[in-house]
Amino acid sequence: MSELETLERTLLAEIDAAADEGAIEAVRVGALGKKGSISELLKTLGSMSPEERQTRGARINALKNTVTEAISARKTALKDAAIAERLARETVDISLPVRSSPAERGRIHPISQIVDEITAIFGDMGFSIAEGPDIETDYYNFTALNFPEGHPAREMHDTFFFAPDEKGERKVLRTHTSPVQIRTMEAGQPPIRIIIPGKTYRQDSDATHSPMFHQVEGLVIDRTANVANMRWVLEEFCKAFFEVDQVTMRFRPSFFPFTEPSFEVDIQCDRSGPIVKFGEGKDWMEILGCGMVHPNVLRAGGLDPDEYQGFAWGMGLDRIAMLKYGMPDLRDFFNADVRWMTHYGFRPLDMPTLFGGLSA
């Protein structure tokens, strides 16, 4: 066996034995580098006669080509093996369901959704949003709203009172959002068109009551506001909110200290099934209270009742959410149960609009 044949077998064996790219690179440098075995053979051609150089040069170049091709093939094989090993290690079962993102799993609470729905409806009518503090003075929560000291209507509210301060004044957790009406009248002149969503507090807890609950009120003050205007506003709201083409409403005389006359509003519905259907049926469901703003309330807000008049209404957000979406127990709103939220909650990007659908 000639010297070149022996070298070829040795190099090919080393190439086959190379287990990684580092090993194959070492073989390449040892054979084809500046001081490699094949490179050293090529250097000897200069001392040979032309005839020997032609014969031996061809054989050395053939050896060089064979080794180069073997190295290239081994590199490719090593890369393919590495990819196959990685795929086997990182196998993914494409039949498994895709894991949803946190944004997809999260839900908007029904109360937040209801507030957005109501804001969209009244915003389209030209109303703005007003807010006020949860901790109120006795004056704003009662006296300014025509609840004088000792008035029996004060007993209608199981109020959370704070201990008296250094001045002897007892603040309260507001029992309704109505104090914001007084603050708004004090802050600016009519015309006023506002809605007031917010938390309220009363000492009551059962399937339909909670110590902390949510209300929304509306207030319109100008020189010509009347009961007919109020009826139209409430009818348009009910049609948009309950997503029906027509509603039949019934106004029953009632009493609230801050309005005169006062009404409780019922809406026609069908209660024969598990979910109340509005705009049809022979039943009635009370949904809100309303009335013309009492002259004493206008005076407390700094307005002249001989010049201005207005109407107001209020409703419980938790209750109308239960009616609209068929939720059986108010206490579930505050239990932070992920299962309940997954069922009754709304997707984060499903913002309610009058044109796209309130509860899409």
UniProtKB/Swiss-Prot annotation:
One of its GO terms (cellular component) is cytoplasm. Keywords: Aminoacyl-tRNA synthetase, ATP-binding, Cytoplasm, Ligase, Magnesium, Metal-binding, Nucleotide-binding, Protein biosynthesis. Its EC number is 6.1.1.20. Mg(2+) binds at residue 260. It is found in: Cytoplasm. Its cofactor is Mg(2+). One of its GO terms (biological process) is phenylalanyl-tRNA aminoacylation. It is an enzyme of class 6 (ligase). Binds 2 magnesium ions per tetramer. One of its GO terms (molecular function) is tRNA binding. It catalyses: tRNA(Phe) + L-phenylalanine + ATP = L-phenylalanyl-tRNA(Phe) + AMP + diphosphate + H(+). It holds the Pfam family tRNA-synt_2d. Its main location: cytoplasm. HAMAP family: Phe_tRNA_synth_alpha1 (MF_00281). Belongs to the class-II aminoacyl-tRNA synthetase family. Phe-tRNA synthetase alpha subunit type 1 subfamily. Tetramer of two alpha and two beta subunits. This is Phenylalanine--tRNA ligase alpha subunit.
